[in-house]
Amino acid sequence: MAKITIIGAGLAGSEAAWQLAQRNIPVRLYEMRPHTMTPAHQTDHCGELVCSNSLRSDDHSNSAVGLLHQELRGLDSLIMRCADQHRVPAGGALAVDRHAFSAAITEALEQHPLIELIRQEIVTPPMEEDGYTIIASGPLTAGGLAHWIEAQVGKRMAFFDAIAPIVSHDSIDFSKAWKQSRYDKGDGNDYINCAMDEAQYHTFVQALLEGEKVAYKEFEANTPYFDGCLPIEVMAERGVETLRYGPMKPVGLTNPHKAEKSYAIVQLRQDNKLGTLWNMVGFQTKLSWPAQKRIFATIPGLEQAEFVRLGALHRNTFINSPTLLSETLQLKTQPRLLFAGQITGVEGYVESTACGLMAGRIVAHKMRGEAVSIPPQTTALGALMRHITGEADATHFQPMNVNFGLFPNFTERVPKKQRKEAYAQRALTHMQQWLQENS
């Protein structure tokens, strides 16, 4: 049997290798460290956590990422097994002893008889006619490999993300907000609009200028801004009126709630096909998360908004997966090539693990000539996979954490306070059914 090639032994690559080897499929796992280090890594361990040691909430009843933890445990995830073995006290979060965690992953991979861990930088991935290659090189993919990937995907690759906050549709106050496209173009209701008067606008701009910012990490410091994705607070620094002539311009829109003309308008654009998530247009930011929640809650209509994703700008290499990848993570133009982890546009340790797990399972089925089945969209894993391979807005695609806004709504009414738990119960039931059908 041909060996499968995996490039990158981070969380996604390590998990993909484990899933394949556990199904008796030999794997060549390439990791360039320690011979070539990244600006962020400190060791040569597989699955090294380069930022926080937290895998976020472990509450599977009220947290989408906690639900994803539980689903991954049921799928024999190596990463989750090592995390549970080396967890440290962190309240309701799953935090780990960073060194022991990555050392355990490395040991498991090195000792598996079907995994060959090769310490070598790959610039041109090997493409075998009877095998598959999984690229899981992570958010710091650079150099020759980045150039090779860019040659395969064209211009649909980014090296810096510009993430605007995303709001749950159900949490927007439509006694103040309204749906309308500028000059009533398109369907006429393509945007949600939140109007400000002059006093509200000037208070908002001042809050942006005074809000605490997140410092760049050392390896991000020299990454330039692009005029098309300036942080909103940087635009505010260029002049008090800049925003109302930019992303907050009020022209072409009529507020049905007030007769007087709006001084500035915040627009939100639909971010997924389900219509459950709405993106704050032009609001990419380096404000701290507490500052974002405080300042953006002053926008009329967003006072009680649920932010399923907050804004950020940082170094991040990722492809436009909704355009490029099939639902099985295969490059549409080269089906023998798969992508997994943060390079696909999933955001976060657990999401990268989940993507790697699915890539490994998919290739295993392909190698055996078996039909491939993706978990239903009602599960955390299925919702995340469908988001990056087609449900997301490809025109404005940016990395995404797992969240309940990716899940289909219920056909029957569920009270808001019970909704998260209901999502979780439905997900675990459907995942169990899927596992029984796809064991």
Swiss-Prot record:
Keyword Lyase among record annotations: no
Residue numbers binding FAD: 8-13
SUPFAM superfamilies: FAD/NAD(P)-binding domain
Catalytic activity: uridine(54) in tRNA + (6R)-5,10-methylene-5,6,7,8-tetrahydrofolate + NADH + H(+) = 5-methyluridine(54) in tRNA + (6S)-5,6,7,8-tetrahydrofolate + NAD(+); uridine(54) in tRNA + (6R)-5,10-methylene-5,6,7,8-tetrahydrofolate + NADPH + H(+) = 5-methyluridine(54) in tRNA + (6S)-5,6,7,8-tetrahydrofolate + NADP(+)
Biological process annotations from GO: tRNA methylation; tRNA wobble uridine modification
GO cellular component: cytosol
Molecular-function GO terms, alphabetical: flavin adenine dinucleotide binding; tRNA (uracil(54)-C5)-methyltransferase activity, 5,10-methylenetetrahydrofolate-dependent
Enzyme Commission number: 2.1.1.74
Keyword field: Cytoplasm, FAD, Flavoprotein, Methyltransferase, NAD, NADP, Transferase, tRNA processing
Main location: cytoplasm
UniProt similarity note: Belongs to the MnmG family. TrmFO subfamily.
Record's function text: Catalyzes the folate-dependent formation of 5-methyl-uridine at position 54 (M-5-U54) in all tRNAs.
Protein name: Methylenetetrahydrofolate--tRNA-(uracil-5-)-methyltransferase TrmFO
Species, as recorded: Magnetococcus marinus (strain ATCC BAA-1437 / JCM 17883 / MC-1)
